[in-house]
Amino acid sequence: MATISEREATQVEAANAGGRTPVVFIHGLWLLASSWQRWADLFDQAGYAPVLAEWPDDPATVEEARANPDVFAGKTVGQVSDHMADVIGVLNKKPAVVGHSFGGLIAQNVAGRGISAATVAVDPAPFKGVLPLPIAALRATLPVTRNPLNRGRAVTLTPDQFRYGWANAVDPEEAKALYEEFHVAAPGLPIFQAAIANLNPGAETRVDAKNPDRGPLLIFTGEKDHAVPPAMSNAAYKKQKHNPGVTELAEMPNRGHSLIIDSGWREVADKSLEFVKRFA
């Protein structure tokens, strides 16, 4: 368990000791594992053992993250995917996996390895082979991509950038509150990895959508998401639905990229829980 944080190890040990089916939650860029806490409480009450997985070197709190933003720099999709596989590898039971944004991409990578009992990908970042690139997504990622040096940096969004890419479907007051409560810096590198994936034969954003052991998969798409517009989630679904496992798409009207943390989080969480209950 050398690569697993003390916080993750504590949750893994509790899951193994209790014998309940684990649910591994994977956050994406600009959030921490703690952003899943309300989801974790809901799944815990439903009889599951939540594991709030972290990206390598993640600080414990938003305050710590803001005090040391450079700790996020340089993390890659491959590193994080392998880390999640390490976390799952020390669980006694095959878990369900829930991920958002780049966490949703990584959740699909994990599922493609055959180590997830059921997978939920909420507005997932595109994996290699997902071709649509809407203008809204280009604008949402511009704070990173406009400077090639951001490949090796951690990038913090301004409130206006967060409002456009994440919180465009909520009112300005809620957008401000979400930024203050949840937003932290994020590595720029995963954005660049996704941007050039279709030109890179060895792209770390690849997903094995054909593996018959992938298991059931639910993909969410928020109608108003600027960071991952519906065209991208729909394209991921079309590639995944050829898998022999159950593959479903949940369309969420009037929802943006903040749908797992904003005031409407419970609707998404309840649908995710219903799906997981069917298979894990």
Regions found by a protein language model. Name each.
Residues 2, 246-280:
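Catalytic active-site module of serine/aspartate enzymes centered on a nucleophile-bearing elbow/loop
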Residues 16-64:
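Short, surface-exposed "cap/lid" segments of acyl-processing enzymes
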Residues 78-95:
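Conserved acidic catalytic loop of the alpha/beta-hydrolase fold
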Residues 98-103, 107:
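Gly/Ala-rich beta-loop-alpha elbow adjacent to hydrolase catalytic centers
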Residues 116-152, 192-199:
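Flexible "cap/lid" loop of the alpha/beta hydrolase fold
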